[in-house]
Amino acid sequence: HKKKYELAFIWIDEAKSITGNNNPTIRNTYAVILFNANYDKPNSPEVLSTLEESMEILQRCYNDDYRKIYHARIFAEQSIKFKSKYPDVSRKRGYLELSMKWLESELKNRPNDRWMNNLKRSIQRNLR
């Protein structure tokens, strides 16, 4: 059942219409589907645009929702993938730097979170 993005978009659009697009978790899911549905396509202006749209949605989710750790995690994971596909755009947009800022903020509340610390180290490696 992997990579059934058209079906996923149908379901997430239905969920968005029911909630009025105000649910950050649904918007986050939409952003993840949008990113994953386009990531493996050949580089093009359209692909870049959809990946950037996904990152913008995740930034709004982080800013709008109290469950920041979830959005920070997804944003950080996508930032690493974005950098591998579009390194120059990634640098210009500052996605990795923003990921680091958010992870450091979340780690203040969970300093021993192994998964978060591993993700932070991965971001640090990608910033070099």
Tell me what each language-model feature is.
Residues 6-10, 81, 110:
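Short amphipathic alpha-helical "recognition" segments used for binding
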Residues 12-15, 19, 51, 58-65, ...:
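Alpha-helical junction/boundary sensor with strong preference for TPR arrays
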